[in-house]
């Protein structure tokens, strides 16, 4: 079992990371993200209620399985326009089995005080043992409580290091030029109104079913994409340009775990949250958007001719560690 507060911290971290990854890989135009402060640093967060709610619901649905310690790793996979995986951002979870044998030995040693004084000191020894036993129990309870509490400062420092590392893989999210462009895009977008071309709720889908954002109309969105294609600086800001990228979230369960309670008919240990299967009906409201879980195979999620890049940002509370790394296709 994992600590509940630790699971909440990890869930919030994954949400933030997913937004940052979608931004740096240009899955959606950068102007559709705004800056928010997280872990004392500015991070890009999507302004789409649909996408934000989708990611949030996806992570929330995993919390019971975090608590049961049945999840081995989570990966956000970037797909090209042919639905071929080209890059994965992987979060691998490993738990440390804490034992209390040493503490029990110390308790036993402390409780066996001066048993040779069987006559004259009998009553004194009884009082001494009771006092020592109670004292040791209180100390052990304090130690156990402290061990069960995640080190929040250490966690936040690890989160911050990871976020900065992936943001710096772009041509600098923190550069003055990009900061100006993002601020300018954010201020100009705020004056835009949703009009025709949406689904009645501000949701916009193009012909391939990819859901776009709720604060611009279809004509404005196409103009943004056209500008990104024609202007080199916008292509640089979104490295993948106009490639119609998509993403999926894969959840890998531990080898000893099957199904993890999401669907009793699943036989694979890899599950997939597919954002393209979110409801797109005109009467759908934001509150009805929930993750769609489907089964997938190892082959479907594999990247051919890939290489691994360790990010060397081990995130830990002292008992549970999250290793982070990326897997990239050699030929995209």
Curated annotation (Swiss-Prot):
GO terms for biological process: cell division. The keyword Methyltransferase does not apply. Adapter protein able to interact with different proteins and involved in different biological processes. This is Mitotic spindle assembly checkpoint protein MAD2B. One of its GO terms (cellular component) is nucleus. PANTHER family: MITOTIC SPINDLE ASSEMBLY CHECKPOINT PROTEIN MAD2, MITOTIC SPINDLE ASSEMBLY CHECKPOINT PROTEIN MAD2B. Keywords: Cell cycle, Cell division, DNA-binding, Mitosis, Nucleus. Belongs to the MAD2 family. Residues 230-244 have a biased composition (Basic and acidic residues). SUPFAM superfamilies: The spindle assembly checkpoint protein mad2. The keyword Cell division applies. Residues 4-332 form the HORMA domain. InterPro entries: HORMA_dom, HORMA_dom_sf, Mad2-like. It is found in: Nucleus. It comes from the Eukaryota. It comes from Dictyostelium discoideum. One of its GO terms (molecular function) is DNA binding. Residues 181-204, 225-244 are annotated as: Disordered.
